[in-house]
Design a protein with these regions (language model features):
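Short, solvent-exposed loop/hinge segments that bridge or flank secondary-structure elements
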Residues: 192-214
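Intrinsically disordered, low-complexity segments enriched in polar/charged small residues
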Residues: 10-11, 44
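Sec-dependent signal peptide recognition
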Residues: 3-10
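Acidic/polar, low-complexity intrinsically disordered N-terminal segments immediately downstream
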Residues: 4, 20-144, 148-193, 197
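C-terminal motif of bacterial Sec signal peptides marking the signal peptidase cleavage site
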Residues: 15-18
């Protein structure tokens, strides 16, 4: 697994080299400018419209650059709200949410610098200055992630190659959509009493039906 991860470094180098100048000399691998990214290793949780305070996304990332992540200064997280119900009328522009500095990175079981990131539903709404009345199920929060290197270089969604972002092998976390879900509030046993009935020799009768809703 470590050999596979180390091979990622050769791949990300290509994304930091300009492709707009045909006169650039061919560089040896050790002398090339390296890029950097955070690889999403796992993600759990959801944003439940009916349980805002307890809803969150928990994400584990590993950091990669030409020096095993040691040249990364910080990992910034921004967020915006994307309204899908009212034609964008409720959308809220991107705002800063959190910065994870290199001093907060930890070394995981595989020996890589990493972070456990908690994105709370309530904390996200507070960042954007909105309440439950301002959001709808089916809309989503879009998170933007940016890496800043110790030498000042910046890597984000806009200057990172699409293969690095979309490939499951690399899973570079530079953008994430978190949809708001509305689970059914009718889960459990439901008893339905009918108003319909009929006459018999014993009088007028009604009936009820019990069912289970998932």
């Amino acid at each position: 697994m470590k050999n596979l991860k180390k091979s990622f470094l050769a791949f990300i180098a290509a994304f930091a080299v300009s492709c707009g100048d045909p006169e650039l000399p061919v560089e040896l691998f050790p002398e090339m400018e390296y890029g950097a990214y955070a690889r999403k290793m796992s993600q759990t949780g959801e944003f439940n419209y009916f349980a805002i305070e307890s809803s969150a996304l928990d994400i584990h990332v590993e950091y990669y650059d030409g020096n095993q992540g040691a040249n990364i200064a910080q990992y910034d997280i921004d967020v915006e709200y994307v309204d899908m119900i009212d034609g964008g009328a409720k959308s809220v522009a991107r705002k800063d949410m959190r910065t994870i500095s290199a001093s907060e990175f930890t070394t995981n079981a595989d020996g890589y610098l990493s972070s456990d990131i908690n994105l709370g539903f309530s904390a996200t709404m507070s960042t954007l200055g909105i309440t439950q009345d301002d959001i709808d199920g089916g809309s989503y929060f879009r998170y933007w992630f940016t890496i800043t290197m110790t030498d000042g270089r910046v890597f984000d969604y806009n200057n990172t190659g699409p293969n690095l972002v979309s490939s499951s092998a690399f899973a570079a976390l530079f953008r994430l959509n978190a949809y708001i879900v509305c689970p059914s509030s009718l889960e459990g046993d439901v008893i339905i009493d009918s108003e319909d009935g009929g006459l018999s020799t014993l009088g007028y009768w009604t009936f009820s039906v019990t069912g289970h809703v998932d």
